[in-house]
Amino acid sequence: MRPQELPRLAFPLLLLLLLLLPPPPCPAHSATRFDPTWESLDARQLPAWFDQAKFGIFIHWGVFSVPSFGSEWFWWYWQKEKIPKYVEFMKDNYPPSFKYEDFGPLFTAKFFNANQWADIFQASGAKYIVLTSKHHEGFTLWGSEYSWNWNAIDEGPKRDIVKELEVAIRNRTDLRFGLYYSLFEWFHPLFLEDESSSFHKRQFPVSKTLPELYELVNNYQPEVLWSDGDGGAPDQYWNSTGFLAWLYNESPVRGTVVTNDRWGAGSICKHGGFYTCSDRYNPGHLLPHKWENCMTIDKLSWGYRREAGISDYLTIEELVKQLVETVSCGGNLLMNIGPTLDGTISVVFEERLRQMGSWLKVNGEAIYETHTWRSQNDTVTPDVWYTSKPKEKLVYAIFLKWPTSGQLFLGHPKAILGATEVKLLGHGQPLNWISLEQNGIMVELPQLTIHQMPCKWGWALALTNVI
């Protein structure tokens, strides 16, 4: 064989070898395929980012923000249940011929600035948001192809609210973008017809719900998909397992998306990604499954209420307590605000969000990316809650009341002589402590004036090398 022939022969041989090699491994997201059954879907591992995030912001906004009276269930309470205060409100403020649909053009969102919202959410210390893309009234905050003349492009704002907020969140913050979606609609004729057939007919999910869900995921790629409002229909009616199989296997967010447990009658607290179990769910003890406490700053409503007084809002102390209790017991806190019809975040909501952010700047180490500890709540000092970071050999004791004696008694941590160290987050200097005779330790807190305190509303001790 002549030397010049070698290159010509080498190429076919190399090609043959490449063809004989095994194919490269598939990307991680397609390594596991999920069947459209709860058994298969429930086995999906929740993306790690969600448990690490701990704190999110819920945003209830829609046409119900126009009357902004009583509740975001205004339409239902007025027209279906005919609750007197809602009926009287309409009689006193609107002409007799006024319909709920007439609120649509009044939902102007004229002061809505997605960048301002994003900056406030970033300042809150939250790690994800969830916006109501469609509530039970059926009005969509994007130009849904399946909600003719009852969406934010055709009516009211005449803007794609979902897109504007998605872009702002992803361009200006490190938060994950999520969407809430109501499966059913109170007064949609197709849903009512299906309901009258005991859900043997499936016109509504086939022509409305499922197409909109696919549209939302493909167009806006939410990393939280927060389902709600099954209308009493089972998951088979909604084809929830079929949709979730697509979401986990094929969708553009298949590797990072998290979902909740509201996918049909009987699924709540039983099937899905993380459990919500009920509104304002806060069990106060450890659960075996990842869960979320969705709750409201306004004690009585998810949507904005013009008649709310200052005592109707949770204080920052109460909100910090909710966060600490929830995270100590393995949950995430999803804290709700309700913007006005103009698209502004009211001063009281903004203040609470910024206060949470200032608290988390000091104490976030004891919240973000933490794990539950062997004890959640101290028995000697009940206002103490625990989190941990096992790899760093850290336990955090978050206490909500500063003891007047300057001594904090902790009944659960056991010190290791010569190894244990205690620090107050935001203070830095190691603190003196002594072991108690039975169990636990007593920590000598630093003597600080109110202006020297690293934060208000709650404090955290970092305990290194305790058992």
From Swiss-Prot:
Where in or outside the cell it occurs: the entry states: Secreted
Any signal peptide, and if so, which residues? 1-28
A Gene Ontology molecular-function term?
alpha-L-fucosidase activity
Give me the glycosylation sites of this protein. 171, 239, 377
**Phosphoserine sites (modified residues):** 301
Which residues are connected by disulfide bridges in this protein? none
Name the Gene3D superfamilies on file. Glycosidases, Golgi alpha-mannosidase II
GO CC annotation: azurophil granule lumen; endoplasmic reticulum lumen; extracellular exosome; extracellular region; extracellular space; lysosome
Site positions for May be important for catalysis, renumbered to this chain?
Answer: 294
Its UniProt entry gives the catalysed reaction(s) as: an alpha-L-fucoside + H2O = L-fucose + an alcohol
Tell me which EC number(s) this protein carries.
Answer: 3.2.1.51
Which keywords label this protein?
Glycoprotein, Glycosidase, Hydrolase, Phosphoprotein, Secreted, Signal
Biological processes per GO annotation: fucose metabolic process; glycoside catabolic process; regulation of entry of bacterium into host cell; response to bacterium
- Note the superkingdom of the native organism: Eukaryota
Leading EC class: hydrolase
Query: Cross-referenced PANTHER family, in alphabetical order?
Result: ALPHA-L-FUCOSIDASE, PLASMA ALPHA-L-FUCOSIDASE
**Family per similarity comment:** Belongs to the glycosyl hydrolase 29 family.
Q: Which proteins does it associate with, and in what oligomeric form?
A: Homotetramer.
What's its job?
Alpha-L-fucosidase is responsible for hydrolyzing the alpha-1,6-linked fucose joined to the reducing-end N-acetylglucosamine of the carbohydrate moieties of glycoproteins.
The molecule here is called Plasma alpha-L-fucosidase
Originating species: Homo sapiens (Human)
Q: What is the lineage of its organism?
A: Eukaryota, Metazoa, Chordata, Craniata, Vertebrata
